[in-house]
Amino acid sequence: MFKEFHSRVPYVINNLQELGVSIDGASKETYEKLRLGGKWDKINENLECISKMKEKHNFRFILHFVVQKDNYHEMEDIIQLGKQYNADRVWLNKMEDWNVFDNFSDMNIFSPEHPLHKDYQQRLQKIKPYLGFEKNPIVEIPTLNT
């Protein structure tokens, strides 16, 4: 998909300053479960293409990952995926209730009442080395509250 876009719209790519991609999982199983109709092989092919184009066109590349019950265990893995594909940042975003999920409270691990909240907090501690303690941190957590 992205290769086709790149070949059809060179002006956009040549003037691109930033590109964000939302990805719901760092594994085939999680990605295809959460992104209905999504294909793990296809997203990886697109990420590889973006990575190569980034080298040539020098735009910022950001991976967005909305953290929830079914993928929070892959927070560290999505950071590694971001590094693999030369992302400038990996944003771990809090899931918000936009009244589109019937089971939001079940998915919302940010709630202290959620049975997996403590495990989420422990996993968040494991990714602290990526959160600005290095010269060039890869991870930003603009909306997550521990």
Predicted feature descriptions by range:
Residues R8-T146:
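Radical SAM enzyme [4Fe-4S]-AdoMet core and its adjacent flexible, acidic
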